[in-house]
Amino acid sequence: MSVKTKTITILPGDHVGTEIVNEAIKVLEAIEAATPYQKIHFDFKHHLIGGAAIDATGVPLPDDALESAKNSDAVLLGAVGGPKWGTGALRPEQGLLKIRKELNLYANIRPCNFASDSLLELSPLRPEVVKGTNLIIVRELVGGIYFGDREEQEESADKQTAWDTEKYTVDEVTRITRMAAFMALQHTPPLPIWSLDKANVLASSRLWRRTVDKVISEEFPTLSVQHQLIDSAAMILIQNPTKLNGIIITSNMFGDIISDEASVIPGSLGLLPSASLASLPDTNTAFGLYEPCHGSAPDLPANKVNPIATILSAASMLRLSLDCVKEAEALEEAVKQVLDKGIRTADLRGTSSTTEVGDAIVEAVTKILKEKA
């Protein structure tokens, strides 16, 4: 059996980014050594992004990092940002926005579920309210107001005006709808689709709604889609989150907000992975960028950050970009086993360190894979 090499660009970023990415690499190396399903080698290419890149090169995304990403099978990112770099002309977050745009990462996939039912008690909502929550937010990532025209005008100190433009095309909405439909069809029976917009006041949302309806009815007639105003959906997500189980599709800004709201339901940002894709993962080889939902946590002491979100992001990378579906399933099972054993960082009311959690997951996934041999 020939060895299959997969190239992964590693962008640790700032603060805890290095720690969490190191744990994910450790787990991936264990999978490489133990998997009985195929001979595989992960070739890691390390580069800078964010504040670390600004300090070293003067820009938040150096050309060599972008070029490496373009020539890789996937990108694994830690986290960017921190108070050191403030909100000036050069900001760490600009590196993330640029790489999304340059790599055409148009779809952000964020699940909201419980990696283990033993975590239900950690949710800020009552366990009986959140039990069974299982939704996937598909956010359009390279269009809308974040990439529209904008301007700040100052005629005088007392007279200032600023505006941002929300703009969507039929093509942009069509491709994100197809992504949501593909995700829905990966389940038996297919998952329902919820489309969130503000069609009662925004022209862009009315185009969004019309396009979603057209794509689903013409291309995916077996799927169901329901429309919900974003403000109403935000309330439902807290009152009765399981009502929104399935696939949620929404625009860039609305997706940014609703996915952050959803991320607190499981009790910790340290649990939730994120994938940003440039194409449908219909052959499990879509190019993607994978990162945790949380930020760089500059105030957190060393070896205290929860690495699970990044490790689960690596599991998503295995499944969607690296054609290692069985390895991804083994890794997700390993995470569940470790959580059920109570090996947890402080954000999950545990006492384990970052490296201890990573080591436990390495041990668990190695055992699972060797049992399959």
From Swiss-Prot:
GO terms for biological process: L-leucine biosynthetic process. One of its GO terms (cellular component) is cytosol. GO terms for molecular function: 3-isopropylmalate dehydrogenase activity; magnesium ion binding; NAD binding. It comes from the Eukaryota. The record marks 146, 198 as: Important for catalysis. Its EC number is 1.1.1.85. Mg(2+) binds at residues 231, 256, 260. Pathway: Amino-acid biosynthesis; L-leucine biosynthesis; L-leucine from 3-methyl-2-oxobutanoate: step 3/4. The keyword RNA-binding does not apply. Keywords: Amino-acid biosynthesis, Branched-chain amino acid biosynthesis, Cytoplasm, Leucine biosynthesis, Magnesium, Manganese, Metal-binding, NAD, Oxidoreductase. NAD(+) binds at residues 82-93, 295-306. Binds 1 Mg(2+) or Mn(2+) ion per subunit. Its main location: cytoplasm. Homodimer. Belongs to the isocitrate and isopropylmalate dehydrogenases family. This is 3-isopropylmalate dehydrogenase.
